[in-house]
Amino acid sequence: MPAHRLTTLRVEKPWGRRDLWPGFEPGVAGAAPVGEIWFDSAPGTDSQLLVKYLFTSEKLSIQVHPGDDAARAAGYPRGKDEAWLILAAEPESTIALGTREVTTREALAAGALDGSIVDMLHWRSVKAGDVIYSAAGTVHAIGAGITVIEVQQNVDLTYRLYDYGRPRELHLAQGIAVSDPIPFVDPLMPGDIGGGRAILCEGGKFVLERWSWDGARQIALPKGLTGWLVPVTGGGNIDGAPFTAGECWTVDGSTVIAPRAASDLLFAYPHPARVPLFC
């Protein structure tokens, strides 16, 4: 079957929340808050992408991910670029992206040691609907009060530079070595290309599209290319099987997707540029 629903994994985090996104059961009072929801591929497979939801009540650690070359030199299959779609954000919520001004890795390391790295970064306000593509090497941190869908290259490789005194391992030497201590520049996002199809991100390690239409359409992925379908709101059918918000599906080959009216779908695939999808 070319469409496959992925397993949902709820991950408890002290910085998480109990009020989640529609499609997910809220956290239980008295239980640990939920910080992440992952969609796991079949055991033994090396999926190129990973989709998560994040729910934050505190600032997360300041961190960085290596690119492909540095990751492979360290024994990993790939580096990590990420994209975020902000679903909800409190009025004062921010995300740190890059440094306020060009600096040196030595200065960044000193800031990580004494905590001044917090003020070295550019904290930008975010709101629902914002899309950010954070390439490997970008020093970043997700702030409090944010609900976000994160699409990333699938590798468990994060270098924490600063964690507000929390007792977790830091990776200062490795992280500084792969950091680009420069201001963040938003990559071009093409946007609406017609037919209910918008390109949110392309030109990096993967393409992220947003779809909204009513009725059935057939898509055909090139051989060897897998897509990830994320129903943000609404639902519908994929190859006759029902899907709904709170799920994630992988798609290979030719598939018929029939969303309900006003449904909001994301579709990601690991390719540097958009490909013809619709038959």
Residue ranges and their predicted role:
Residues 92-127, 222-245:
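A short beta-strand-loop-beta hairpin characteristic of the jelly-roll/cupin
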Residues 1-103, 164-185, 208, 268, ...:
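Transition-metal
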Residues 121-133, 142, 147, 237-258:
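Short acidic-glycine-tyrosine-enriched beta hairpin
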Residues 159-226:
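C-terminal amphipathic alpha-helical segment
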Residues 112, 120, 131-133, 139-187:
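An exposed, glycine/acidic-rich loop-and-rim segment of catalytic or binding clefts
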Residues 82-85, 141-164, 262-279:
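A short hydrophobic beta-strand segment most commonly corresponding to one strand
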Residues 51-53, 60, 76, 82-85, ...:
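His/acidic/aromatic-lined binding-pocket segments of jelly-roll/cupin-type domains
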